[in-house]
Amino acid sequence: MRDRWLKRAVGARHYRPWLTERGSLTRRLQQHSRQFAVQPLHLARKKPPLAEAQLLQVLPRQHTLQRDVILRCDGEAVVFAHSLLPQQAMRGTWRGLGRLGSHSLGSALFADPRMCRGALQYKKLSPQHFLYRLAVAHIPAMRGPIWARRSVFRLGRKAVLVSELFLPSVLKLPLINK
């Protein structure tokens, strides 16, 4: 089964401003909360699914570091984030990305002016999608389809794939800090 993602956030309506933001999601969430937090859920070496391996330009049998976190604003879960970092990318400038703990990956990526972000891709995930299943294992209250986006960040030949699932609670966030 092919995992088709869209080049535009067609049909996303209320989620579109969140999905299409090309800047740091961490910074944007901080503007909408008094207390922003990263809740680490899972960190492990794994073989990536075929679609993700293709985006990262690695063989599906090559191990990647998989990191899953929940981004929280004032205690409320608003985004489930899933990132994959090929083993060979964890050297040099990005060697610390595997040890972020409760620190934001976005802050680390956007701190380097040499970093290039690839095109954003969008998808309304059904409960059958593997990313949805990853998220619902940690957020059992999730119901119905969830909008997500993904993109590849590159620094030279190194790449990291970041997928973000926007929970309905993100739509209720007030603007607190400009």
Swiss-Prot record:
The reaction(s) this protein catalyses: chorismate = 4-hydroxybenzoate + pyruvate
Pathway: Cofactor biosynthesis; ubiquinone biosynthesis
SUPFAM superfamilies reported for this sequence: Chorismate lyase-like (SSF64288)
EC id: 4.1.3.40
Broad class of enzyme this protein falls into: lyase
Domain of life: Bacteria
Matches recorded under Pfam families: Chor_lyase
Keyword tags: Cytoplasm, Lyase, Pyruvate, Ubiquinone biosynthesis
GO biological processes: pyruvate biosynthetic process; ubiquinone biosynthetic process
Keyword Iron-sulfur: no
GO cellular component, one term: cytosol
Entry annotated with the keyword Lyase: yes
Listed InterPro entries: Chorismate--pyruvate_lyase, Chorismate_lyase_/UTRA_dom_sf
Molecular function as annotated in GO: chorismate lyase activity
Protein localization: Cytoplasm
Binding site for substrate: R67, L105, E164
Protein family per UniProt: Belongs to the UbiC family.
General function of this protein: Removes the pyruvyl group from chorismate, with concomitant aromatization of the ring, to provide 4-hydroxybenzoate (4HB) for the ubiquinone pathway.
The protein's name: Probable chorismate pyruvate-lyase
Organism this protein belongs to: Methylobacillus flagellatus (strain ATCC 51484 / DSM 6875 / VKM B-1610 / KT)
Source taxonomy: Bacteria, Pseudomonadati, Pseudomonadota, Betaproteobacteria, Nitrosomonadales
Name of the gene encoding the protein in the UniProt record: ubiC
